[in-house]
Amino acid sequence: MMGDVWGEKDTRFAFIGLAICSILGDINRIKVEPIVEYVEKCMNYDGGFGSSPGGESHSAQVYTCLAALAIAGRLDIVNRNRLSQWLCERQTQPSGGLNGRPQKLPDACYSWWVLSSLEILGNLHWIDASGLASFVLKCQDEENGGIADRPNNRADVYHTCFGIAGLSLVKYELDGHTLPEIDPVYCMPVDVVSSLGLSHGPSGWKSLLPSHWL
């Protein structure tokens, strides 16, 4: 899908286009099937997705593709177990953090990109949740607040947002309090998604899943 007047194509735009139309309640305004076909061409032998056909699998692209396919009602084309295995391999040791692709350093933002994808796939339990939570908490700026990409780096709003979203997905609890539940498709609190009329049924985002996944 093309994202600007200069013709740039990227699977991120597939998700963005579908999400915008879905949020506006006008999904039929966009041609869904060509988007699905493009996303499918970006799927790799390892189960992951690249930014374009033949591109290297990347955790952030995996999320955008899964979320796009979920909104389109076409998660059936995904190799669920193979992709889940690839995503689990993103957890690094001994840090417990997640990276975007092989041989890269862990980064707090992948707490969202990887975990949201595993949640959609129904295999979030394959990850060491306590190890991941420990890594994200170590990325905090104890004096000024916020979360950085890695421990001892400067915090920013980007990593703070996705670090907290990741903690929500693993149901991190502190002093008996948990974070609001996050919808893994839209990256918004579940109650916000519901108020916008995006729940897609009584089961919320799970109504978007293929029946044989449930």
Q: Where are these predicted regions, by residue range?
A:
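Solvent-exposed loop and edge beta-strand segments that line ligand/cofactor-binding
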Residues: 2-11, 49-59, 97-109, 148-156
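Solenoidal tandem-repeat scaffolds enriched in leucines and small polar residues
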Residues: 4-61
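Alpha-helical membrane segments in multi-pass integral membrane proteins
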Residues: 11-15, 35-36, 40, 59-63, ...
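Short hydrophobic alpha-helical segments of the AMP-binding
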Residues: 17, 65, 163
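Aromatic-anchored, glycine/proline-accented short structural segments
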Residues: 36-103
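Terminal, non-catalytic domain-edge segments
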Residues: 68, 73-93, 103-214
